[in-house]
Amino acid sequence: MTEKLYDKDSHLKEFTGAVLSCEKTGENYTVTLDRTAFFPEGGGQQSDRGYIGEAYISDVQIKNGEILHFADKPLSVGQAYDCKLDFDFRFRNMQNHSGEHIISGIVHRLYGFNNVGFHLGAEMTMDFDGELTRRQLDEIEDLANKAVYENLPVKAYYPTDEELKSLDYRSKLDLKENVRIVEIKGVDVCACCAPHVKSTGEIGIIKILDFEKYKGGVRLLVKCGTDALRDYREKYKSVLEISNLLSAKQPEVSLSVVKLNEQLSAEKAAAAALKKRLIAEKAAGFAPQTDKTAVFEDGLDIKELQLLADALCVKAGGIRGAFSGAGGAFSFAICGEETALEDFFAKFKAAFNTRGGGRNGIRQGTVCADCAEIERLFTE
């Protein structure tokens, strides 16, 4: 049985461990040690990573009670190696996981909701079996950070059977023996196998970034500690860039973006109105000499092409196509009586590299061809 050093000291960065076994598994080697500080994936948290000697450990799993280290190099059985954790990675995981305990404890105490899902990978999410509002989440976030400011001790221990009976603790599983408890006094008591910070002050900050309804409850996206700092830094850079672009004070950036969006919407509406006038004028002056016509106009989207083709068809009948694009690539809409249009569009697709379709007297899509080639087909 491997001695679990991470159970005794969550801040242990280096240790010496003897190799009990080393077996090749695919491209890696599966290694067991007599003692390890590497935490295996579990409880929603990803495993530690680091080095055993010169071998890089990319993953750690526990199977049938055995802790398996996945190494990129073989190691000698019976030899003791200096081992080193990627402690920045471990500490980041501990900050987030301990932050999750604080939030879960507060949610349970205030609203009676249970944490029914937890994942800590590149992002951290937690699921609760009841819905929470933005205002409630703000209150939870304030209380969570208050617990951080108080720098409360985080205690991990194995209670006796008698002690366990008297404990009111959170647990997703019905555990009977070897229950490891992580306690943050006055905030949370929870069964957990993972390493945690020694005191809440090490977490630094807890930030609830987003939430969504999920399976009758709510899913939270949360960042703690270093992750929260990096997130703030990146968002601050974005706010600063937007502030400079809009010549707006940082607290007024949101209002400035709203005003800019309103201006853009007004300009889009004005442009759409002008295009509708263009379409109407184009149709009013349309006097074709043949029963098929291709018209080319710059800057029209597919809906505007549909309007133009339909207006031309209403004015003069026959089959009328509207095209917009450049460099031999066009969006198009073609209107006409369905039976005649179906026959013509079959020839159109056979002649050109065309993507599109439709029904009820209209076909639309994209085509790669020269203007002259398209016009030639419409005059045949």
Range-by-range predicted roles:
Residues M1-E380:
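A glycine- and charged-residue-rich anion-binding loop/surface
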